[in-house]
């Protein structure tokens, strides 16, 4: 798991106007919370934070005002829906050795059996519990040779040592569908529309 060091400043200005001023300076407003402490409102460096968030479940080592060092993981990231820049981030305070609940991305590898099958992600991220400094970046699942009707459940996924499922083991994560079955309703709808027009 990667750890990124960021310098943060506490902030005392709040509201939309203050947030706009912070973003204009290429910084991002954020909140650090957890362990029963009061939320701490922060200003974080925009570019460095953006680079850090490219890694899922990144561990962030915060140097706050040059006085306090804390570890955190991102819990909620708000982006501008059009331009994509960071608007706000919520960080969860963590301690080394502490177990946290997170979602790790699921990555399928391998080729499905020949015959025009589609792979559907029922869950694109798997809820797990892991030690805060050892959160996997992703889990990889082999789908090689699977045919329509096959599914992979949460309990079928091999997890790294120290990582436990935080979801029912019978939860379907991936399933294989027949491409022809997916196309059939579309053709039927087209015929119905043609009949209606006639």
Curated annotation (Swiss-Prot):
It comes from the Bacteria. GO terms for molecular function: 5S rRNA binding; structural constituent of ribosome. InterPro entries: Rbsml_bL25/Gln-tRNA_synth_N (IPR020056), Ribosomal_bL25/Gln-tRNA_synth (IPR011035), Ribosomal_bL25_b-dom (IPR020057), Ribosomal_bL25_C (IPR037121), Ribosomal_bL25_long (IPR001021), Ribosomal_L25_dom (IPR029751), Ribosomal_uL5_bac-type (IPR020930). SUPFAM superfamilies: Ribosomal protein L25-like (SSF50715). GO terms for biological process: translation. GO terms for cellular component: cytosolic large ribosomal subunit. Keywords: Ribonucleoprotein, Ribosomal protein, RNA-binding, rRNA-binding. NCBIfam families: bL25_bact_ctc (TIGR00731), PRK05618.2-1 (NF004131). Belongs to the bacterial ribosomal protein bL25 family. CTC subfamily. Part of the 50S ribosomal subunit; part of the 5S rRNA/L5/L18/L25 subcomplex. Contacts the 5S rRNA. Binds to the 5S rRNA independently of L5 and L18. This is one of the proteins that binds to the 5S RNA in the ribosome where it forms part of the central protuberance. This is Large ribosomal subunit protein bL25. The lineage of its organism: Bacteria, Bacillati, Actinomycetota, Actinomycetes, Kitasatosporales. The gene is rplY.
């Amino acid at each position: 798991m990667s750890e990124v060091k960021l310098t943060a400043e506490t902030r005392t200005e709040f509201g939309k106007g203050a947030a706009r001023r912070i973003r204009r300076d290429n910084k991002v407003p954020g909140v650090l919370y957890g362990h029963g402490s009061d939320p701490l409102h922060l200003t974080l460096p925009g570019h460095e934070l953006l680079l850090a968030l490219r890694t899922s479940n990144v561990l962030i080592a915060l140097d706050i005002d040059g006085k306090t060092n804390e570890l955190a993981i991102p819990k909620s990231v708000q982006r501008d829906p059009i331009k994509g820049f960071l608007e706000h981030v919520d960080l969860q305070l963590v301690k080394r050795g502490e177990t946290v609940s997170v979602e790790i991305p699921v990555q399928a590898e391998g080729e499905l059996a020949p015959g025009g099958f589609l792979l559907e992600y029922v869950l694109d991220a798997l809820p797990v519990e892991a030690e805060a400094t050892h959160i996997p970046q992703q889990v990889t699942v082999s789908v090689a040779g699977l045919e329509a009707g096959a599914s992979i459940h949460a309990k079928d996924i091999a997890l790294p040592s120290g990582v436990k499922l935080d979801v029912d083991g019978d939860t379907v994560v991936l399933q294989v569908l027949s491409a022809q079955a997916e196309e059939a309703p579309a053709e039927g709808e087209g015929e119905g529309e043609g009949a209606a027009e006639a």
